[in-house]
Amino acid sequence: MSRFRKTLVSAFVLCLVIFPLLVSAAEEENQCGGSKGGSAAEKASALKYKIIAFFSILIAGVFGVCLPIFGLKTESNFFMYVKAFAAGVILATGFVHILPDATESLTSSCLGEEPPWGDFPMTGLVAMAASILTMLIESFASGYLNRSRLAKEGKTLPVSTGGEEEHAHTGSAHTHASQGHSHGSLLIPQDDDHIDMRKKIVTQILELGIVVHSVIIGISLGASPSVSTIKPLIAAITFHQLFEGFGLGGCISEAKFRVKKIWVMLMFFALTAPIGIGIGIGVAEIYNENSPMALKVSGFLNATASGILIYMALVDLVAPLFMNQKTQSSMKIQVACSVSLVVGAGLMSLLAIWA
């Protein structure tokens, strides 16, 4: 029953993303109406490339997620370099790919100049709100796990009142921070089960941010009538999904999910962009991505996704990796992780030229 509920939740999340996009983009055409495509031959040619994109992106997504999950040992130094690379990829996805897309949508001339559009930085506001919400979800989830664990052990949370007691707890916090444990609950000793559970929460929120963007780019590609637009997007989005999958796969591997859960998360990520392409193909005749409501919906979704990914990359991936004891005690590991982070961010940023 629990698995069934989780499946329903996943389907509900997809519907929340897809349905508003389709309804808003099918409204009456306005002065900013999108192109309707050309001849039947051009549409047939475009369809052929869309089918190629469907399978290419699907395979790249599966391969990207599977490589760190099934091909690497999480205890090795090399896995740390992979995590740094993955963090760079996710950070660049948020800053270079998704945030500019959101800004373009929410500052479009098609929305007019009346408040809150025009000069107001709506994209930054939404991204900031998403980051704060992500932090609150993590904080409350972590607090709930701590209270549940301590309740089972018949203990209560320690409360600092100053003086020696506060100093003792602070010292404990420093010890845990230096050992690379969670940054979120420094006053509370955390066992391995709690740390693993927190990693699972982080990974699931991260996948949500990635999936939202994957659906949007899939629908956009599937609805595009232009062969000249689709051709470069195939390669760009294929590598985009490969690198994103690589980043997500590293987090899934470290979170130690059960095998069935791993496969569910793997397929949930790998199928979202291809499903988006399929939906885009089906609604290509009515889909107008330049309608005001479609711009608002896609802009808000992209801004939300960027806020989630930027927060997760910096707070939950980069900071714990670079501040843990193993990295800090070895110049070789520190330099290698730094290079991997820059390479991951650089390669993902480079893809923004084409996608």
Swiss-Prot record:
Localization of this protein: Cell membrane
Membrane side Cytoplasmic: residue ranges: 72-77, 138-200, 253-261, 324-334
Disordered as annotated region, ranges: 156-183
Predominant subcellular localization, coarse grouping: membrane
Keywords assigned: Cell membrane, Ion transport, Membrane, Signal, Transmembrane, Transmembrane helix, Transport, Zinc, Zinc transport
Induction: By zinc-deficiency.
Protein name (database record): Probable zinc transporter 12
GO aspect biological process, one term: zinc ion transmembrane transport
Function, as annotated: Zinc transporter involved in zinc uptake in roots. Targeted by BZIP23 transcription factor in response to zinc-deficient conditions.
Signal peptide extent: 1-25
One GO CC term, this protein: plasma membrane
Protein family per UniProt: Belongs to the ZIP transporter (TC 2.A.5) family.
Extracellular-facing ranges: 26-50, 99-116, 222-231, 283-302
MF terms in GO: zinc ion transmembrane transporter activity
Membrane-spanning segments: 51-71, 78-98, 117-137, 201-221, 232-252, 262-282, 303-323, 335-355
Pfam families recorded: Zip
Membrane topology, as annotated: Multi-pass membrane protein
Highest rank taxon of the organism: Eukaryota
PANTHER family found in the cross-reference section: ZINC TRANSPORTER 12-RELATED, ZINC/IRON TRANSPORTER
